Every structure is written in C-alpha cells, then in structure tokens.
A protein has these predicted regions:
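A short beta-strand motif that forms the metal-chelation/ATP-contact edge
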Residues: 10, 251-253, 403-406
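Short linear recognition/processing motifs and adjacent strand/loop elements at protein termini
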Residues: 20-29, 33-35, 43, 47-49, ...
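Sec-dependent N-terminal signal peptides
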Residues: 4-13
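Active-site-proximal helix/loop segments of hydrolytic enzymes
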Residues: 279-443
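Catalytic-core environment of secreted peptidases
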Residues: 258-283, 336
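Bacterial Sec-dependent signal peptides at the C-terminal "C-region" and cleavage site
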Residues: 12-22
C-alpha cells in the first residue's frame, strides 16, 4: 500500500513538472504590437532548463527568469522551450508611423490669461520631460505670438520665449499694462522671504545657480526688456515656496532643519489599490512590496524622532495629486516615494539593468538622492543603478526635498531573489533612514 502511494505521489509530481515553467509575461500567445520588444518573465521548476529562440536563459536560484526578444516589423515567431514544455508565441509588429513635423505658426501678439493654478510653462512645445521652467498661477496675464500643435508660444522678453498648452489659457480683451509697485525682503533665522508686487499677475521663471536662485518676473506688455530679477542666496540644504496673490509674489526660501526631531517626512508607498505597478518574475505585485517597505521606514523614522506622514497605510487608491497635497498640507520637509523598477520598451539589457536607482527633479534634491542611493545599495545589497532626473509628479514640487527610490528591478531575476527575501523591506528601510540621518545631520 505504501509503495502504491509513493508511486502515485511521484507520478503526480512528474505530471506537474511536465507542464514546466510558468510565464507571467506575455499574457497572450498571439498579439499585435507597436513595441520594439517582447518580454518573457516567469518562474521555472527545479532542474528545468529554458531556451527562447535557441538562446539559453539564465534562471535564478528561486526559479525567476526574464528575457527580451527584439521584434522586427511584421511576423515574429518566438519559441520557448524547456525540458518539460514547449510553447510558441506569435507577435505582429506594426510598421512605425513617421511623425509629421508640425510647423510653428506666427501671428500678431495677443493677450491670454491662465485659467487654473499650477499650469506648466515649458521651454519646448512638448508635453513631457524636463522642460518645465515654471508653474503659473491662475489669472496670470501672458502675451502669445505663435503656436505649434497644442501649444502657444509665450513672449516673455526680447530674448526669452516659452510655451504653454492651449487648454491652460483663455483669450481676453482690453488688458491694461501692469505697473511695478514695490519690493521687500525679510530675513529670519532659517528662512528668507522676498516679495515683489505688480498691479496684476505676471509670469515668472526660476533659474538655479550654484549659490543663488534667480527669480525673474516678466512684464512684456510694458517692454521687451522689462524683467525684474530677485537674486536669492540659497543655503546648502533648502526648499522654497512661491505664492501669488493679487499681483504680489511671495518667495520664501527655507533652510532644512538640522535635527531629525524637527523634520516632517512624508513616506509614499507607490501605487496601491487598482494600480498594481510592475509585476515580478514570480507574479508579485509591486504595490505590496512598496507598502511593506514604507511601513518599515515609517516605524524606523518614528523611533528616531521624526514626524512621519504616510500617503497610504493599506492597499488603497491614492491619486498623484492627493499624495502631493498630503505633503503640502502637512508642511513636509522631505518626501520619499518608494517603488520597484521595471524594463520599459527601450533597448536595455534585461539582466544588466538591476539594482537601486534614485530620481529627483529639482536641484535642491540632488545631494539627498545621491546619499540615499548609496545607503540603500549598501544596506540592501543591491547594485548601484545611479542617480537620475525625471519629471515624476510627486517629486516635482519645490516645497520639499523630494526623491523617488526605485529599490530594485521587478523584472530582473537576480533582484527577484533579493526583494523576495524576508529581510529586504527592513534592509531598504534602514538604508533610506540612514540616508535621511546623514543628509539632515551633515550640515
């Protein structure tokens, strides 16, 4: 009887293994694609070997594997073969559509007004990237003299133009030329406040130099050379706030407190709810790992004396705008967004791209990003993937020092071994906390 049961168990095990690997991606065996690559991500059984179109695939110790196949225009046949199973995938890649260059249309200067707060003023007529040079306030008066696609060209000064989305402005008639009223400056222990007043709302730009910030207000209706510049010395570690009410700009630049007990840190667990984030080789959802790390980090920082605010403490949907508003309402000094990375539709080596990277947008956050990237890699044992710039919504505000930490790559088999370990969340949390301590305390 015992021999019979043993034989049955061995038979069932063999039957299960004969099915072979489990693919998380791709989800369909046949697809029409505009992508340059097809990604194969999944888990292999013990002792299983896999090849994709004849190329042997590396399998991590936990069974995780990943591979990318470059797609040519037209039919693509991909054979995934193991010693247990063979599957065939078919992709049809559409021919790329050649982009048509849209010309700039010039026209006589006319006046428009910004119709909502936080309207991006850009250096180029492109909706995306690092081209934001200001975020304009509602009722700001602008002069436009051209258009390209969905953007108007904004005339700021004789040697300065910018671009704003057509949807962000409304036409107005009979605008009166603004006049300068006054300028004032006040210094406090850890902050400097400067004001500059006009008879109506005017556009501005920011330019960060090594030791100062140039805050420029433009009055092109008066003349092409009417530019008012505030030269604001900046501390080593700082953040700033800009407000505009009835033509008066208030610019406040604050020095970051040097004691953790005086710091408010917003800990942001990326994604959540229906936003799953990236999917790992073994089928894990990024949102859950993000939350686990965030909870560990929050507890660590509270123990160290920091005031901690979380954007989510459970698996729920929180919009990007709400995450930013949480930080602003709580007067956050530091914002840390926690994520795991994945490979996009670009010619990356799926095995080379691994480890921890940290993103920042504003120059005041660069040093903090460098410290945290080094600290997380040291504590978590991840490869250092670098410090980079990106226009992520949660780190764009200048009201705080903000970074987004990509702790590891969900789609990398070696990283999969790390982020699936029980200690990963605690190690990453310690790395971020150590980075905050070093950055805040190293005045």
């Amino acid at each position: 009887m015992k021999k019979g049961l043993l034989f049955l168990l061995l038979f069932l095990l063999g039957a299960a293994q004969s099915f072979g690997y489990e693919l998380i991606l791709p989800r369909e065996k046949s697809a029409i694609s505009n992508s340059n690559y097809a990604f194969f991500v999944g888990k292999a059984n013990n002792g299983e070997t896999i090849s994709i179109n004849g190329c042997p695939i590396y399998i991590a110790q936990n069974g995780a594997f990943a591979h990318s196949v470059k797609l040519k225009v037209g039919e693509n046949r991909v054979v995934v073969r193991s010693n247990y199973n063979t599957q065939i995938y078919n992709f049809y890649k559409n021919a790329p559509v050649k982009a048509t260059e849209i010309p700039v249309t010039d026209f006589d200067i006319r006046t428009v007004v910004v119709n909502h707060d936080n309207a991006p003023l850009r250096s180029t007529p492109i909706d995306g990237g690092l081209n934001r040079i200001a975020h304009l306030f509602k009722d700001t008066t602008l002069l436009i003299n051209g258009s390209k696609g969905q953007f108007y060209r904004v005339f700021l000064a004789k040697d300065k133009v910018a671009w704003i989305a057509k949807k962000d402005v409304d036409n107005i008639e009979g605008s009166q030329t603004a006049s300068f009223i006054n300028m004032d400056s006040k210094k406090f222990k850890n902050a400097t406040i400067q004001t500059i007043s006009f008879s109506k709302n005017l556009p501005y730009t920011l330019e960060e130099k090594d030791k100062e910030i140039l805050f420029k207000v433009y009055n092109p209706e008066l003349s092409g050379s009417s530019v008012y510049t505030l030269n604001l010395p900046k501390p080593e570690k700082y953040y700033y706030n800009i407000d505009l009410k009835e033509g008066t700009y208030t610019f406040k630049i604050s020095e970051l407190p040097s004691a953790l007990e005086e710091i408010t840190v917003v800990v942001d667990a990326g994604h959540g709810g229906s936003e799953k984030g990236a999917i790992g080789c073994l089928g894990q959802e990024e949102k859950n790992i993000n939350l686990k790390i965030a909870l560990e980090l929050a507890e660590t920082l509270k123990t160290l004396g920091a005031n901690v605010i979380m954007t989510r403490e459970c698996d729920g949907n929180v919009s990007l705008n709400d995450r930013v508003e949480i930080a602003k309402k709580n007067d956050a000094n530091i914002f840390v967004s926690i994520h795991l990375n994945s490979i996009g539709d670009i010619p990356m080596n799926i095995h080379k791209n691994r480890g921890t990277s940290v993103y920042y947008f504003n120059p005041n956050s660069k040093k903090f990003a460098e410290v945290v990237e080094k600290s997380v890699s040291k504590n978590a044992g991840t490869r250092r993937d670098g410090v980079k710039t990106a226009s992520f919504a949660v780190i764009r505000p200048y009201n705080y020092v903000g970074i987004l930490v990509e702790t590891a790559y969900m789609t990398n088999p070696c990283d999969s071994v790390l982020y699936n370990s029980e200690s990963f969340a605690a190690k990453v949390a310690k790395g971020i906390a150590d980075g905050i301590i070093e950055y805040v305390g190293n005045q």
